[in-house]
Amino acid sequence: MKVPVSGDVKEETEEENVEQEENQEAKVSLKPVIEDLSMELARKCTELISDIHYKEEYKKSKDKCTFVTDTPMLNHVKNIGAFISEAKYKGTIKADLSNCLYKDMPATIDSVFAREVSQLQSEVAYKQKHEAEKGFSDYTHMKEPPEVRRAMEVNRHQSNISYRKDMQGTHTYTAELDRPDIKKATQISKIISDAEYKKGQGIVNKEPSVIGRPDFEHAVGASKLSSQVKYKEKFDNEMKEKSHHYNPLGSAFFRQHQFAAVLASDWEYKRDFEENKGLYHFDAEAPEHLHHKGNATLQSQVKYREEYEKNKGKSMLEFVETPSYQSSKEAQKMQSEKVYKEDFEKEIKGRSSLDLDKTPAFLHVKHITNLMREKEYKKDLENEIKGKGMELSSEVLDIQRAKRASEMASEKDYKRDLETEIKGKGMQVSTDTLDVQRAKRASEMASQVRMV
């Protein structure tokens, strides 16, 4: 590597060079020549061809630089210089290519054809290369390096270790059965359960025995018969579903015949197509087609002019008569109905309306229904309940009359059910027993019958 030398060495070398130049000038005898274009050209050519200037520069720089060992910094500087020179060279080449004359040439048929052929060839070659390399990529056949294999094993072991740690942490708590508080709690729970069981058993034993009574035996027999009937019906239904049914559509003969019919229809269709092939030809430039096309355009223009004359003089805000406005209106209507149905299916259908009772329309309908109910109630009260133990006068309030009417209706229904359903089933209904005792006895019998 060449590096500059100190100042004293430079001065000495310069003095020696000056002395040598003076000696050379003294030796060479100069002759005047006529300066013309040929002489200038010759001088320039000789300067370019000969290496005189190179030798002079070499002699001038001689002893000014000395060779030293390469250091990392010097190597870095050399590499950077090489990269910088390459970047400058590429930049100049790109600038020259962008300003080349070939780019400004007019496109000819041959150049366009050559460009298209080259593009097609590049696409064909790329596709062939892609098809050839499909399924044979290097990534699929790449061997696993030791680092990747080591990382996979470490990840697998770490996942197992963490999973086991979490599992052990969740199962660390184990209850001790020999603790005094647990023993005491179990004993108390057993005592409470025994007491409740005995209490319930005593209540059951206090009830009168119903085993051996005729009505109870009859109910047991009826329940057995009904269970047998239901079991037979269920068995018959299951056997009907599982019984063998002949399905002609699923037979092999029918499927074969159907397949043959399909093949025959395809063959007939192909034969008709081959026979009629070439008989029909649609010519867009035929006189008949052009005549029909002209008539259609004339008719459309006549209709458009009629609509225009009809709507002439009307304001531009009235879009009802125009076909585009009508089509947009119908489309908007259909879209709104579709959106409303979607919202109804998603949000409203199947859900209870929360704010429906707060709307004015609903409140109005509710008020009207209340008035109609009061009117119907008063009419029924005057027609049916009057003369049945209650005097109707203007001094009696509507609330008292309604209360008395409801009590009479409930007593009537209760007595009718009691006489028709419960009487004759082991209980004598007399006028001396209280209504509360009769109702209690009836409820007990009904519960016993349901239990049986």
Curated annotation (Swiss-Prot):
Gene Ontology annotations for the cellular component aspect, listed alphabetically: Z disc
Compositional bias segments (type: Acidic residues): 11-23
Repeat (Nebulin) residue spans along the chain: 29-63, 64-98, 101-135, 138-172, 173-199, 206-240, 263-278, 279-313, 315-349, 352-386, 389-423, 426-452
Superkingdom to which the source organism belongs: Eukaryota
Annotated segments matching region Disordered: 1-26
Keyword presence, Cytoplasm: yes
Protein known as: Nebulette
Organism, scientific name: Mus musculus (Mouse)
